[in-house]
């Protein structure tokens, strides 16, 4: 488990990283880190870590057990976090909510409350530029045909709630969920047709299925408002997520394609629970290693 002593020790090594100036990122892409992968650090230390490494933005995780879970993230704590984000010049583009389109009625009602709570948190943290929301969709690939009509109904309810709360929800395809492909994700978006529902892009889930990077970007980037990035190895049914740079993804090609498709916005490292739940996981080292791999590739993209 990471400790404050480890945080202070590893902070001394930040200067050795290939630092990429935040103000001079090619193509309007900025690198970020999801605090989903820093559960064992205090929020203050997590933000300091990300800023010192060179990240331009962070994602807060609203999951149970995190310091930013809505029911424990007090008004005073939100005020302090907003001030620290400003001081460190870190943007907060997104809040991870992890709700499901295949939930039962009770869980669906809770999901709607989560949307409202997250929208309020976004305003509390930055009324001028509130963060949007991000989630996967739930279900299993094999149940898509049976569940898709119900998922549309749930998504319509999400959209209505998001519109009233003046927020945007980005939904993400996942290799293990009912929505596992660009086509299925786009189909859902087309059924609901709400500006409050957009796409989140994460190529690692498509790579595992042999889906071409360029094709997935061509389909999804016109509707994409947020990007997660990580590596992966294996195939559907038996896979392992990895840190960026540990897998097969060519990140020079990746960032070049993002630029060619006109994407402007955050590319945020998501450390999978497959990684951070392993004994000996160190969030600071993971953030450093991920930044080094991505910043090096991004610097090569003119």
What function would you assign to each model-found segment?
Residues 34-38, 61-65, 97-100, 138-140, ...:
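Active-site beta-loop-alpha junctions enriched in small/polar residues
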Residues 61-82:
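Glycine-rich, proline-tolerant flexible connector loops at the mouths of alpha/beta enzymes
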Residues 11, 17-20, 45, 84-91, ...:
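Active-site acidic/histidine proton-transfer and metal-coordination neighborhood
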Residues 70, 74-77, 107, 111, ...:
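Residue-level preference for long, well-ordered alpha-helices that form the structural scaffold
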Residues 65-69, 101-105, 141-144, 208-209, ...:
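A short acidic, helix-capping loop that chelates divalent metal ions and anchors anionic groups
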Residues 29-33, 58-60, 92-97, 131-135, ...:
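Hydrophobic faces of well-ordered beta-strands that scaffold small-molecule active sites
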Residues 50-61, 115-124:
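Conserved long hydrophobic alpha-helices within structured protein cores
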Residues 2-30, 39-56, 182-201, 205-302:
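Histidine-acidic metal/acid-base catalytic patches
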